[in-house]
Structure formats: structure tokens, C-alpha cells
């Protein structure tokens, strides 16, 4: 198959004419660290600004929804909140005073006699064991058992 006669003999004359210089390559354009830092800082600032813009947009949507809901579904405060100006500040509309409801009872007039004073009543209600067990089963542990109701005083 392949005998000794097929071996290659070196040609000394041909080797002398070939040059062994390395091929020249053009330098590849590489980005320096200086440009990478600028791009990173720019991307960070753009991300922060976009996040702030998104938060402002969500805030405006919530604010307009609350305003729309307040105009469409007015919450009527109780008679006590209509006549006590300190408590009416806790309502959603802080700037406008509440107009009295013509269908409600007139406010109690303050006495001009200095001897009379305001009296307060404190009441506690005791539930029977049967009802308290029923309430404990149906409600969670943080249930507030205090019930508030309007009390009308007549002379």
C-alpha cells in the first residue's frame, strides 16, 4: 500500500524563498471602561427616571379615582359630624364646611346659664354566655365587641 518510495524529500531551495512573517491584523474596535461606565450611569439614571414617572402616573390615577368616587358617591356624615367642626375635618373634604341636612334634627342649643354643665353617660353591655360563644365562633379574635349607637335625649 504505501511503500518506502512514497516519502517526501525536503526541498531546501524552496524553503529559503518563503517568509515566515506573521500575518498583519487590523485592531478590533473595543470599548474602553470609560465608555462602559458612562453607559452604565446613563442606564441607571434612565431607570430611576422611568420608575419615578411610573409612580407619579399611578399616583395621579389613584388621586383622580378618589376624586371621581367622592363626587359620584358622597358619604353622608352622621349628625354628630355635621355639627362638631373639629370632627368634620376627618372627612374626605377638608376645605368645605358641611351644610346641615334639612331632614335631620336641629342641633342642641348651648345653655346660657353658667351653672349648667354637660354630663356624659357611660354604658356597658353584657352579653349572655350563649351569645358570646356564638360571637366567638363566628368572628376573629380581634373583633371589637363595642357597639355604638345614636342616643337622643328628650326632656
Swiss-Prot record:
Lineage top rank: taxon: Eukaryota
UniProt subcellular location: Membrane
Ranges of biased composition (kind: Low complexity): 19-28
Membrane-spanning ranges: 41-61
Annotated membrane topology: Single-pass membrane protein
Modified residues (Phosphoserine): 140
GO cellular component, one term: membrane
Keywords: Membrane, Phosphoprotein, Transmembrane, Transmembrane helix
Protein name (database record): Transmembrane protein C1orf162
Gene (name only): C1orf162
Species classification: Eukaryota, Metazoa, Chordata, Craniata, Vertebrata
Chain segments carrying region Disordered: 1-28, 92-114
Coiled-coil parts of chain: none
